[in-house]
């Protein structure tokens, strides 16, 4: 088994020039050629930003609706009441509730990928914050998941919204499609993500904003990208 894995990786590494930072177009082409798993692998971009997340004014966080989605079916839970519950259901939310939903979550129900809430329900959401927070599911105004426009938020989530935030080391990881996507769709998704991240550059960040960038599949080595080319995307 280990021998098979080693041979597979060796074959994949042979397709990459380790000392080269690829342009977006060529990088996408190379990473697609690395698809070798028996399932449709996720394409992920990783960026190392020149920020210090220990400072609140350098915390890069946001959301972007990818033009071609992520290729993943997203289950959405909504905390709302009265007419807003109806709006959520009509927009296609999978789970809708209030205190009852909070109780279900306390009892172990986490069968959704994104949580949206109206502002007046955040006190209820707060009761399960310790459960949702570590899973990256806590609603936040910066990602458009705390809003009165529930229908739009649910539609965005279902259409391929990706929420992102910089980690303690200044890295951002985000899915931008599947290996089965045409190269052009992966490229357009990545450009939309990078454009959004560039717009969120903190004014206090110094030096190069995008220090390193890489593209990879679920089961593949990473392909280095030209960070300067990404910083020039507006």
UniProtKB/Swiss-Prot annotation:
Q: Which GO terms describe its molecular function?
A: rRNA binding; structural constituent of ribosome; tRNA binding
Q: Per the record, what is one GO cellular component?
A: cytosolic large ribosomal subunit
UniProt keywords, alphabetically: Repressor, Ribonucleoprotein, Ribosomal protein, RNA-binding, rRNA-binding, Translation regulation, tRNA-binding
Q: Which SUPFAM superfamilies match?
A: Ribosomal protein L1
Listed GO biological process terms? regulation of translation; translation
Q: Known InterPro entries for this protein?
A: Ribosom_uL1_bac-type, Ribosomal_uL1, Ribosomal_uL1-like, Ribosomal_uL1/biogenesis, Ribosomal_uL1_3-a/b-sand, Ribosomal_uL1_CS
**What is the superkingdom listed in this entry's lineage?**
Bacteria
Its function, per the record, reads: Binds directly to 23S rRNA. The L1 stalk is quite mobile in the ribosome, and is involved in E site tRNA release. Protein L1 is also a translational repressor protein, it controls the translation of the L11 operon by binding to its mRNA.
HAMAP family with a match to the protein in the record? Ribosomal_uL1_B
Query: So what family is this one in?
Result: Belongs to the universal ribosomal protein uL1 family.
The protein's assembly and partners: Part of the 50S ribosomal subunit.
Which named protein is this? Large ribosomal subunit protein uL1
The taxonomic lineage of its organism, from the top, reads: Bacteria, Pseudomonadati, Campylobacterota, Epsilonproteobacteria, Campylobacterales
